[in-house]
């Protein structure tokens, strides 16, 4: 019986292989000196599709194209030195992408070649959020898709758009896009996605999870072993958050500034930024459209040249949703602004159940005494961004407001230059455990930790080699504050 089953499987595989054909685009009329090879290449795809599937090979050379539509069971293979180059005519892209897959199964884009979106061409320069600018790759409502090893460069819009797909693997690709506005790296509004071993260098958000459709949940996604560079946010959830994000893990990634910055010039615009090229937020978790976030784990992340290492925001742009059950661990960062890492909800709607563990931040410093007393506006319905509260926050390490059930474990904030702000400011925070932590002593009389309107707080295990004038300042509206087991030998005033 076992031999019969094995024979049937082998027969099935042989039948499939018999129908899987290999074709080269030049066999269908594609030429390197042609103005437009779209029709010829599409014929190659259609031929494979009509014969049960196969592989379309792109040989060495540059081929001008507009939209190429992928087919079921047909694989695109770009050989070394092969380039599919977008024709700079916005009217030619239907759907709005150089490579498009709509409701297809079992297809791939692989090889050592390149797809060039020509996003820096003057014909695509419409401005931020405007114009019919094509993606490099658009996959909509597809399943069982592989994108591997290819280089995707110079997109006119988002480079890779994964829209409501189920079962996508993105492995070992390189993205370089700095020629236009909105040049995201990979946008994920899909399920069951694996992204690994990629190098992403782009002008807008590098990895962006978007929940763009009510009732469609973005879930079961893993990202690992990537190098991420951006002039905007490196790892972002939102801004679109209509339904939700659930069961997502990101690990073992390096975040750095982009290789170039042709649009954003940050130096001198905001205090504490000394270079034109920086990442806005290393990690930005945003729910502002009435959706939810649940069970997101981010670990082993090293970042440098980021304005704000961590930005977590529950807002009310189109409705107040929920943001809970988040773990961030093993994160190191050197920041490049006075816009502190923050975790903020809004009055009556709390960020809940967040753990930060094994965190080391090298903070810019430079805060003055007046900065420590800044009143931070709520801005409940504002666009979520690290600078939404202003260029300076009243703490140099973390500013936290409207949060319940928060754990900080083994968190270190080290100053690059003197700062008169406290390291941590917690306002309207309930059930907080701040344990086994370190921070550079602020100048003047600022405490390490400032508590406002907070309750059920445990501050323990503070360690220091410096003299600390004040460890914790407990202000109006606080109750059940437990300060214990700290390095009291260097602390002049505990509370």
Predicted regions and their residues:
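Extracellular/periplasmic carbohydrate-active domains that bind, remodel
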Residues: 19-495
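Bacterial N-terminal signal peptides
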Residues: 7-17
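Positively charged n-region of N-terminal signal peptides that target proteins for export
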Residues: 1-5
């Amino acid at each position: 019986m076992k031999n019969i089953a094995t024979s049937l499987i082998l027969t099935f595989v042989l039948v499939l292989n018999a129908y899987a054909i290999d074709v080269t685009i030049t066999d269908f009329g594609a030429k390197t000196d042609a103005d437009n090879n779209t029709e010829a290449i599409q014929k190659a795809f259609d031929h494979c599709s009509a014969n049960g599937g196969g592989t379309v090979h792109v040989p060495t050379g540059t081929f001008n194209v507009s939209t190429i539509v992928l087919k079921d069971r047909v694989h695109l293979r770009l050989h070394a030195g092969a380039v599919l180059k977008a024709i700079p005519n916005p009217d030619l892209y239907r759907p709005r992408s150089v490579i498009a897959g709509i409701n297809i199964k079992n297809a791939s884009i692989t090889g050592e070649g390149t797809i060039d979106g020509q996003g820096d061409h003057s014909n695509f320069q419409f401005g931020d959020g405007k114009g019919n600018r094509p993606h490099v790759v658009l996959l909509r409502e597809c399943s069982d898709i592989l994108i591997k090893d290819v280089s995707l460069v110079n997109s006119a819009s988002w480079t890779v758009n994964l829209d409501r797909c189920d079962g996508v693997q993105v492995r070992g690709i390189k993205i370089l896009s700095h020629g236009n506005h909105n040049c995201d790296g990979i946008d994920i509004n899909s399920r069951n996605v694996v992204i690994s071993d990629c190098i992403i260098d782009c002008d807008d958000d590098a990895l962006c999870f978007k929940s763009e459709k009510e009732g469609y949940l973005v879930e079961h996604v893993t990202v690992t072993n990537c190098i991420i560079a951006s002039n905007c946010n490196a790892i972002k959830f939102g801004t679109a958050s209509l339904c939700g994000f659930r069961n997502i893990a990101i690990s073992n990634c390096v975040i750095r500034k982009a290789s170039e910055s042709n649009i954003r010039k940050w130096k001198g615009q905001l205090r504490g930024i000394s270079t034109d090229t920086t990442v806005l937020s290393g990690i930005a978790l945003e729910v502002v459209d009435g959706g939810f976030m649940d069970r997101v784990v981010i670990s082993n992340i090293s970042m440098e040249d980021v304005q704000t290492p961590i930005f977590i925001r529950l807002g009310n742009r189109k409705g107040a949703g929920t943001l809970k059950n988040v773990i961030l661990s093993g994160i190191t960062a050197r920041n490049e602004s006075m816009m502190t890492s923050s975790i903020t909800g809004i009055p009556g709607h709390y960020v809940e159940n967040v753990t930060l563990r094994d965190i080391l931040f090298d903070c810019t410093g430079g805060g003055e005494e007046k900065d420590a007393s800044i009143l931070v506006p709520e801005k409940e319905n504002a666009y979520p961004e690290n600078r939404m509260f202003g260029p300076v926050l009243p703490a140099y390490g973390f500013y936290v407001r409207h949060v319940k059930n928060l754990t900080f474990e083994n968190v270190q904030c080290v100053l690059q230059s003197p700062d008169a702000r406290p390291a941590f400011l917690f306002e309207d925070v309930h059930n907080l455990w701040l344990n086994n932590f370190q921070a550079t002593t602020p100048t003047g009389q600022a405490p390490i930790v400032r508590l406002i309107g907070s309750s059920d707080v445990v501050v323990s295990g503070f360690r220091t080699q410096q003299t600390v004038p004040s460890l914790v300042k407990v202000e109006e509206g606080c109750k059940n504050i437990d300060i214990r087991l700290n390095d009291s030998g260097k602390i002049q005033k505990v509370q």
